[in-house]
Structures are given as structure tokens and as C-alpha cells.
Amino acid sequence: MWGVGALALVLITGLSVFYRAQVGKKVVTASTSVNGQELPICSVQTGKKQIAYTFELSGTQTGKGQVEQMLQILQQQEIPATFFATPSWIENHRSLAIQICQQGHEIQGLGEQVVCVEQMTAKACRKELRKIRETIGTVTEEPGVFFRIPGGEYNNEVLRTIYACGSYPVAWSVDSMDWKEYEAGELVRQLLQSCTIRDGEILRFHGEGEDSGEMVKLLHPRLKEEGYEAVTVSQMVYKDCYRMTTDGRQIPEKSK
């Protein structure tokens, strides 16, 4: 049904949930929870100075100009990025979605709307994942296997459903707070002051935010000076043989 032949077996222990799924012809195994609490992927222990820029594109937003400006900045800065887009955004901006992929970025799935985490069900999640995969398939041959729920709130049922369907829930470890009504320079200052960037950080931006592009233009050169390289979520996240920490950090069980 999912195009990846997903099958999951969850084994619950006192400390973690071990997940086995068949994706295509490969069986993957991972521990996706801590103390019975399922966790989305927020960052990755890469062993390399890598970071992933992610941008959210919602169907309720109309800032085409901001997205085009962002693409120019990403090209100038030589940053490959991951765009989490809703099905409605892709349908309403199909040519722009194709342009995103043609410029070396990737499109992954974003839930259509923010809902109370208690209202999320496995059935609704499966339906949304199916719609997202079908829609992403209209603009790129690359499968959409990463999924983000708006607002970043998950529950165990939804997370287990995402994993069981052969997908990976991805949140973030660094929030740009680009929705705040501050100048880009001040937002960058606050970001660097509030957190210490480490390898495998997943940075969250709004692709249609008025200050998002300027923030990236100011932030990335500073991180580049410190030796950080930008990669896509697909290039950074482990698909197999990993465990999670309490803050949603992927730890490899063996070499990638």
C-alpha cells in the first residue's frame, strides 16, 4: 500500500522499543524510544561537522517571492536544504516545487495543519502519509520518507505509525524563531547566544518567512568558518542500526 512494503514489529522492553521494518528488500532495525516514550529525530550524532537546514512550506501561506529569494540565497551560499511541504502547498506551487528539486534540494512531507496531539490517530496519520507520498511523487522521483508534524508535537501512537509505514518522523534541535518580529541580525544573535551548535543539528526555518532568507545569509558564513558543512536530512539521518537519546538524538550502533 505504501510503495515500500512496510511491515513493523515492535518489541517493548523496560528501556526502549526496537523497531523492525521491511523497506523494499531491506530489513532495518532501530531503537526509536527511551523508557517507553517514542521520539522523533531531532538531531544526529554524525561524527562530522554537519548541519541540516530545513524549511517548512504550508499550504496556508502564499509567500512565493520569499521562497524564490530563499532559493537564490541557498544557491549563492552553496547550501543543499530540505523543504518540508504540505500536499496543498505542492499542488498550489507545483512549478516552484519542481524548481526546488532541480536545484539540488529535497522535498519531504509536512502535515497539513497543526492539531492537538491528543486528537492524532494512527488512521489519520496513515492517510496523511499516503497523501504526502503521492503528492511528492508528482514533482520528484525521490521518495518522501521523512515526515514532520506542524508544531513538532507527537504521541506514541502516531510515531509508531510513522515508523511502521516505513517513514521517519523528523523534528528539529535548533529553532530559528524566524517568526518573531525582529531584524534578521538580532535573530541570529539570539540563536547563537541561546544554543551551542554541535554536529548533526537540524535547523528549523519557515520557507516563506520574511526574515528567513536574510537569517541564513548571515548565519551560514559564521557556521562555515567553524567548519560546518550543510547537508540534506536524507544525507545525515541514519535509516538503520541506531538508538535514540532522551532529547531525540540519533546515535549510530555501528558505522554508517
Question: Where on the chain are the PLM-derived regions?
Answer:
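C-terminal domain-boundary segment and adjacent tail
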Residues: 34-47, 72-78, 211-256
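Active-site beta->alpha N-cap acidic-glycine motif
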Residues: 26-120, 124-138, 142-144
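Short low-complexity, flexible loop/linker segments enriched in glycine and/or proline
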Residues: 97-100, 123-125, 184-188, 245-249
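Hydrophobic membrane-insertion alpha-helices, especially the h-region
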Residues: 2-18
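Hydrophobic single-pass membrane-insertion segments
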Residues: 16-26
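Alpha-helical scaffold elements lining the catalytic groove of polysaccharide deacetylases
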Residues: 61-66, 115-140, 153-199, 211-218
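A cross-domain feature marking catalytic cores of carbohydrate-active enzymes
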Residues: 55-57, 83-87, 109-111, 149-151, ...
